[in-house]
Amino acid sequence: MSNQHTLLTSNLLPVGSNISTWWNFGSMLLTCLIMQILTGFFLAIHYTANINLAFSSVIHITRDVPYGWIMQNLHAIGASMFFICIYIHIARGLYYGLYLNKEVWLSGTTLLITLMATAFFGYVLPWGQMSFWAATVITNLLTAIPHLGTVLTTWLWGGFSINDPTLTRFFALHFILPFAIISLSSIHIILLHNEGSNNPLGTNSDIDKIPFHPYHSYKDMLMITIMVTLLFIILSFLPNLLNDPENFSKANPLITPQHIKPEWYFLFAYGILRSIPNKLGGTMALTMSIMILMTTPFTHTSHTRSMIFRPLSQTMFWTLIVTFIMITWTATKPVEPPFITISQTTTVFYFSFFIMTPLLGWTENKIMMMKN
């Protein structure tokens, strides 16, 4: 056995033999991150962060640069794949009680916030119609902050409206934040290696562990291969599946799109924002839709870690999944009845998961005690 192989295998923790496919999404996320950084680097070489040239430079990349269309589409579709994997990764954590490993969960939530900021800045860079107006709407939310809001917005914009300085700083932030994501990912993985992975049963894995390599590493490779295959199928046959048609027009501050919306992976948060008629209230709800994930390690009441043996909590979990899909769907629709009512109802359901789950955990404990 080579020295390199010994070094690799000696640093890989043994893992519980019963972990399922849901445990493969961490390695898939790492693959997405590497792919995004590589494609992003090649795109940055040809991109021009200027409001008069940005849109043309993206067209130049797709038309004139050799394999530029592959790089551009890989980067755009790869971002969607990144968010699909991260949402499944979070759902797995909620279902199997992985949030009880507090340090790993809190570092992961910080990673999610950084990732969302990076994706938002990236969406603005092509300087299409939807890029411009989505940036205007979202950055304008800062004005809801009492006393400091207007000053913060002007500081972020680099002027009194979204203009050339805004695009320049958004490009700088979009370029630098992935390095912060690499650092946070390293911290996330190091913290995970303190205790090691949990398993679907939520029990201690020490009695039944197997080497990570080759058993789980090959399993990871299978899922990564499936993900990359799916990515290239979309890239080859449906490259504009996840794009907004409005973004094929250059940004025009004088023409407002009929329906302003961000990328699909932000629609659940945008739907929560729109469901509240008050600007400050909507901004707070938008922030809380992500930040509330940080409360889960401190509100767990059940004696059982995983939801696998808790039918009441399972019902709440699947209600949350359906709610997430419903909010995403309603956020694509105009602000008019019945979508306003649906949006408000689903927002209540979304937040009720984080309130009801601790109460259900307490109820389940009582039922178990009665049976004993």
Swiss-Prot record:
Transmembrane regions:
25-45, 69-90, 105-125, 170-190, 218-238, 280-300, 312-332, 339-358
Q: Name one Pfam family in it.
A: Cytochrom_B_C
Positions the record marks as coiled coil are none
Please tell me where this protein is predominantly located: mitochondrion
> Which GO BP terms, alphabetically?
mitochondrial electron transport, ubiquinol to cytochrome c
Its cofactor is: heme b
Sites binding a ubiquinone sit at 193
Q: State where the protein is found.
A: Mitochondrion inner membrane
InterPro entries, sorted: Cyt_b/b6_C (IPR005798), Cyt_b/b6_C_sf (IPR036150), Cyt_b/b6_N (IPR005797), Cytb/b6-like_sf (IPR027387), Cytochrome_b (IPR030689), Cytochrome_b_C_euk/bac (IPR048260), Cytochrome_b_N_euk/bac (IPR048259), Di-haem_cyt_TM (IPR016174)
- Which GO molecular function, any one, fits this protein according to its record? ubiquinol-cytochrome-c reductase activity
Gene Ontology CC:
mitochondrial inner membrane; respiratory chain complex III
CDD domains (UniProt xref): cytochrome_b_C, Cytochrome_b_N
Q: Which UniProt keywords apply?
A: Electron transport, Heme, Iron, Membrane, Metal-binding, Mitochondrion, Mitochondrion inner membrane, Respiratory chain, Transmembrane, Transmembrane helix, Transport, Ubiquinone
Q: Any binding details for the cofactor? A: Binds 2 heme b groups non-covalently.
Query: How does the record say this protein sits in the membrane?
Result: Multi-pass membrane protein
List of residues binding heme b b562: 75, 174
Chain positions recorded as heme b b566 binding sites: 89, 188
SUPFAM superfamilies for this protein: a domain/subunit of cytochrome bc1 complex (Ubiquinol-cytochrome c reductase), Transmembrane di-heme cytochromes
The remark listed among the other comments is: Heme 1 (or BL or b562) is low-potential and absorbs at about 562 nm, and heme 2 (or BH or b566) is high-potential and absorbs at about 566 nm.
The UniProt family comment states: Belongs to the cytochrome b family.
Q: How does it assemble?
A: The cytochrome bc1 complex contains 3 respiratory subunits (MT-CYB, CYC1 and UQCRFS1), 2 core proteins (UQCRC1 and UQCRC2) and probably 6 low-molecular weight proteins.
What does the function comment of this entry state? Component of the ubiquinol-cytochrome c reductase complex (complex III or cytochrome b-c1 complex) that is part of the mitochondrial respiratory chain. The b-c1 complex mediates electron transfer from ubiquinol to cytochrome c. Contributes to the generation of a proton gradient across the mitochondrial membrane that is then used for ATP synthesis.
Q: What is this protein called?
A: Cytochrome b
Q: Which gene does this sequence derive from? A: MT-CYB
